[in-house]
C-alpha cells in the first residue's frame, strides 16, 4: 500500500515538472500560503522577521532591493515538515528592510505578497538602490505629475516636500499633492520645475528627518514637425542611389528616437545614420537628423517611406512615395489637349502633360518657328500667353527629349482665339446727332467678330422714356441706362423703319458684318440700339436719334377767332437746337403772299420792330413762347413772326403766321322745313343747316319739348340731321329746329303726319329675334374664349410650397416667410387714413378690429374693413407671425371666395396692422344655427317667403349667370390695394339685403359648399394647405358669398372648445384626417377630409360633428378602422355620398377639389333647372328613416328605391344627371358601400348637468357658452318648423349648438371672456322637447332613437 502512494506522488511530480518545463499552466493551483495571514505587517527594528510559505510546487522568495545589505542577512531555508515549503528569515531588521515580500511559484504569476514596515524612528525614510542617482526628471506639462521616491518605514508619517532654490515647502492637500509610504511624494511637475533640488522631510517628536536630495531635471517632449527631403515626386531608375533625410525640430532638452518604415526594410545595402544638428546659440529649438541611404535600388524598393520621430510623450510622422522605373523613358500624358479655345485678352495656359524619367527637355514651336520667352510668352513646362490676341492663333508644337536616352516625343496643339462683337462706329467720338423732321435717314452698324455674329438685332425706345435720373448710374460706356427696349419690328408710336439684310465686307483688311437701318420718316426723337451676339460675347451701340424742326406757330384754340374771343399764339422750338425765342408783328396789313418762313434778310432786320410780350414755358424737349390776345378785335389781325436762334451756328430762323379775326354774325338757318306725311314703319330724314359767327348750336323740339336721341331717333352731324326710324303714331307732331348763339336764335318748324294702323311685320320680328340670337351666340363664344385664355394663363404660374401650412419636405414656414417679399410701395396704407372702430374679436396675442379705410380702393372713398393687429406687449415672435401671415396673403393673391388682403401698415411709428375684407355676417357656423327655424328645403314659384305662414322659397335671380361668374373667378396677381371685385358683377340685379331676414333653402347649402370648394381649389393651385378647414373659418359676406379665412394668426386654441388636448398640443381632431391624427401629415388630401366634415356641418345647419361621441383614443381608433358619421339631417343622398368620398381612408382615393367643384357645380346647376319643373324636396310629412344595414340617415320615400349607386326617388331628381354620372366615373370614387359603420346615437338617460373645467374642455371636445345656453333654452319653446326635417336631438350634441360662438374671424376674432358655463347634455334637451310636447298636447310621436325613426310633429 505504501508503494502505491509513493508511485502516485512520483507520477504527480512528473506531470507538474513537465508542465513547468514547457511553461504550461498548472492544473488548478492555489496561491502560496504565508504563515502570517496579513497584507501589512509592522514590526520594530532589531527584531527578527520570519515568514514561512507553503504551496503545491517549487517556490521562490523576492524581497525589497533597498540599501540595507539584506542580500547577506536574508536566509531562505526549506521546511522540514513539507515538500513545497520555504522559510524567509532576516535577523535584526532595520528600516531599510521595509518593503514588499513576495512568495511565488516558479515560472508563473501566482504569488502571495505581504508588505512589512520596519519602524525605525531614527531613519524613517528608506534609501532604495535607485536613489543612488538622486535625479528626478520632470516636464512642464500642467497635466503631468511627478513622484519623488522618498518611501517611508513608518506608514503614518507627516511628510512635506522641500524645494531649493528658492526654498519652498509643499504640504499634502489631499488632492493633487500627496505622500504615500509605499510610493513616495506626488506633486504636479510644473510646481517644482523652477527648483534645483528637492527632498522629503518628516517630523517625529519635534525632530526633523530628511530623505536624500533629488536633483530636478526639466526635460522637453514637444516635436514641432518632421520633414522629409526630398518631400515628393521622388523617381529613380533601377540601380540608382536613394537618399532620404528626415529632420525633426523639437524644443530643448528633448531626446528623439527615429523609426523608418519602407518596403524593403531588410535591404542589404541600406544604411541609417542618426545625429544631432548644431543649433545657433539662443535658439529655442533643436534639430535631429536621420538619413536613410539605399545603394542600387530595385523595383522592390518602390513604395511608401515613412519616418517617425518619438520623444516618449509625443510622436510625429511624415511620408513620401518613391517610384522606381525599370529604365529612362518619356511619353505624353492622356490629358494632353489638341484644341484650345480662348477669347481675346484672356490668359492662356497650355501645359505639356508628360510621363517620363528623368524629366525631359521641353521645346515649344509656333507654326514651325521656335518660341522664346518674353514679357508676353512664358515657354516652359507650361506655355503661358499673358493677353492672347488674334495674332496668337496658330499651331503650337511641343517636343519632349529624354536627357539620358535622347528619346523624343512631339504633340501639336491648335490655338483658336475668338473675338467678341466689336462695333466700329462705337469708337468714333460724335455728339448727339440731330436729324431734320420728316427726312429719311440711314443708321449703320459695322461689326467685327470671330466667329461672325449669329445675328444683329435692332431695338428702339422713345427718347423721353430713357431720360437720366439722379439715382441711375451712368457710365461712359453706357450713357443711356434704358431698360425697356422694343424691337424695331414693333415701331408703334415711333418712326417707320425698314431693316436691310446683313452684308459682309472686307474693311481695313478684316471681314466685317454691316447692318443698316432705314428710317423712312424722322418724326419722333428716339434711341436706337444695335446688338450683335456670337458664341463668346455680345456688343452693342446706342445711337441717339434726335429729331428737330424749325420753330412752329400754332393757334390755341386751333380755329380762326371771332371778335371778343381770346386766342393764343404758340411758338414751339426744339430746346436743344434753338434759343432766344421772340415774338414780332409785321404790320396790320397781311403779306401779299402766304409764306411759312421769312427770307433771311427780312429776318435779320426784325430788331427794328417792337417786341411783343409773351410767356415762356419749357418741357423736356421744347421751349414754348406763348403770346395771348384777350378779347381779340379786328385791329389784332396781321402777320405775326416768331424768331429763334440756332444754338450752334447762331443763325436766325423766322416763321410767320397770319392771324384773321372774324366779325360776329347772328345765327341764320338756310332753307325751311317742309311738312311731311309718312306711313307707320317708314323712316323720316330731315336736315337743318345754320350759319353764324360764332357757330350756333342746333337743337330739335317736338311739340315744344326737347327731342333727345332714343332707340328710333338719331341725331347726327352736330344735330343738323334728324332721322326717325320705323315711325309710330306717337311720332306725329310739330318739329322745330332752333339754332342759337350769344347773338340770338333762329328757328324753322314743320308738322309730321303719321298714317296707317300700329302693327309689326313678321319680317321685323324675325330680324329682331335673329339679331338677338346671333348676338347671344357671339357673346357666349367670347366668354368661352376668355375663360380658356384665363385658365391657360393661370396654369403657368409657378409657386413654391409655402402658405398657411408648408409641405413637411420643404423648408420650415418661418424660413420660407423670411424669403417672401413685401413691396411697401404696393401694399403700404397710411395709418392716418384708417379709423378704428369696435373690436370684432381677440385671440391669444392678436385682435381684430372693425375699421373705416379712406381711399383704400378706387370704387369708394370710404370702405369698412377688418384690421388684424397685435395686443400690447406682443413678443418679437408674435410680430413675426403676423408679418408672416401678411406675406402669405400677398403670395396667395386675390380670389372671390378667400378673405382677401387690402393693405397693411408696417412702417415704424405705430402698430403692425394687416387690412383684410370685412364680412358683416360673421362665420358660417353661427349663421346656419341662427337659420334653423327659417330653413325650407324645397322651392316653389313664389316670389318671396311668407314668414309665419308658408315656408316656400324662390330661386335666386339669375342663378346660372351667378354660377358662371363664380366659377370663372380666377386668381389675380394682386399688387397694391386690391380693388375689390364688385359683387354687382356677379349679381347685377340682386339688391343688397339682410341675409338674416331671408329664409334658407337647400340651394343655399349647395351654393355655400360649391363656393368653399372653389376657394379651396384656388388655394390648392397656389400650393397651399389650410389645415383647419371648418365652418367656423368660413365667413359670410353680402349676397350669399362665402369666403375662406384663418391663415394662421393667433387662434386662442387654449380657450377654443373645438381643439382637443393631445399631449401638450390642442388639435381640432373632429376635422382632422386619420393620417393627420396618427402621422402628423398635412396634405391637400387631408384638407379634402376636412371639407367633408365641413359639408356635414353645412347640411346639419351648424351642428357640431360627431354628436355625442367622446373624443378620445377610442374615437381615433374607430375612425381609423372606418367608422364614419351618419348622414346629417338636411342632406341628400348625393351630398352624403360626397361626404363619404371625402372621408375615404386612403388619401389618394379622395376626390380633388377640382372634381368637387365640378360635381357641386353640376348639383347646383341641376337645382337651378328645377324652376318650374322638378324641385329638390326633402320629405315633410314622413319621418326620416334609418337603414339598418348602413347606418345612414337619408331623406327618402317609405319604399326605398336605392339600387347600388343610383337614387331613383323623384323627390331627389336632378336634370343634370349626366354631369353627375360623369363625375362619378372620372373621379376616384368607388361604389357605394353596402354597409357603413357609423358612430351610434347618444342613449336616452337622465339629464346631467356638468360644470365646465377651467380649460373649457369636455370629453367631447365641445363646450356650451352661457349666451348660447340661453339660446338653446329659448329654442325648446318653439315647435318644429316642419315634421320631416326636425333634427333628431338624439343625434346632435346640444353642446355643439353653441360651440365656438365668435364673430367669425377665427384668426384672432376670439373672445377672451371665458366665464364658467353649464353644460347641458343631449338627453336633457331631448327630455325638454318631450316635456314640452306633452304639456302642449301635441300629437308628437315619442319614438325610441335606436329604432331608426326620429321625433316628428305635424307641419305648421
From Swiss-Prot:
Expression across tissues: Detected in cornea (at protein level). Widely expressed.
Signal peptide: 1-19
Record keywords, A-Z: Angiogenesis, ATP-binding, Cell junction, Cell membrane, Cytoplasm, Cytoplasmic vesicle, Developmental protein, Differentiation, Disulfide bond, Endoplasmic reticulum, Endosome, Glycoprotein, Host-virus interaction, Immunoglobulin domain, Kinase, Membrane, Nucleotide-binding, Nucleus, Phosphoprotein, Receptor, Repeat, Secreted, Signal, Transferase, Transmembrane, Transmembrane helix, Tyrosine-protein kinase, Ubl conjugation
Cited Pfam families: I-set, ig, Ig_2, Ig_VEGFR-1-like_5th, PK_Tyr_Ser-Thr, VEGFR-1-like_Ig-like, VEGFR-2_TMD, VEGFR1-3_N_Ig-like
Post-translational modification summary for this protein: N-glycosylated. Ubiquitinated. Tyrosine phosphorylation of the receptor promotes its poly-ubiquitination, leading to its degradation via the proteasome or lysosomal proteases.
MF terms in GO: ATP binding; cadherin binding; coreceptor activity; growth factor binding; Hsp90 protein binding; identical protein binding; integrin binding; protein tyrosine kinase activity
Extracellular side: 20-764
Residues annotated with Phosphothreonine modification: 1238
Effect of residue 801 to F: Abolishes stimulation of nitric oxide synthesis
Protein localization: Cell junction; Endoplasmic reticulum; Cell membrane
Impact after mutating residue 1147 to S: In HCI; somatic mutation
Primary gene name: KDR
Entry remark concerning the domains of this protein: The second and third Ig-like C2-type (immunoglobulin-like) domains are sufficient for VEGFC binding.
Binding site for ATP: 840-848, 868
Stated name of the protein: Vascular endothelial growth factor receptor 2
UniProt keyword Secreted, yes or no: yes
Effect caused by changing residue 1214 to F: Loss of phosphorylation site. Abolishes reorganization of the actin cytoskeleton in response to VEGFA
Effect of residue 482 to R: Probable risk factor for HCI; expression of FLT1 in hemangioma endothelial cells is markedly reduced and KDR activity is increased compared to controls; low FLT1 expression in hemangioma cells is caused by reduced activity of a pathway involving ITGB1, ANTXR1, KDR and NFATC2IP; the mutation predicts to result in loss-of-function and disruption of the normal association of these molecules
Annotated positions of the Phosphoserine modification: 982, 984, 1231, 1235
Phosphotyrosine PTM positions: 801, 951, 996, 1054, 1059, 1175, 1214, 1305, 1309, 1319
Enzyme class: transferase
Region (Disordered) location: 1274-1318
Species in which this protein is naturally found: Homo sapiens
Residue spans crossing the bilayer: 765-785
Entry GO terms, CC: anchoring junction; cell junction; early endosome; endoplasmic reticulum; endosome; external side of plasma membrane; extracellular region; Golgi apparatus
Effect of residue 275 to L: In a colorectal cancer sample; somatic mutation
Associated clinical condition: Hemangioma, capillary infantile: A condition characterized by dull red, firm, dome-shaped hemangiomas, sharply demarcated from surrounding skin, usually presenting at birth or occurring within the first two or three months of life. They result from highly proliferative, localized growth of capillary endothelium and generally undergo regression and involution without scarring.
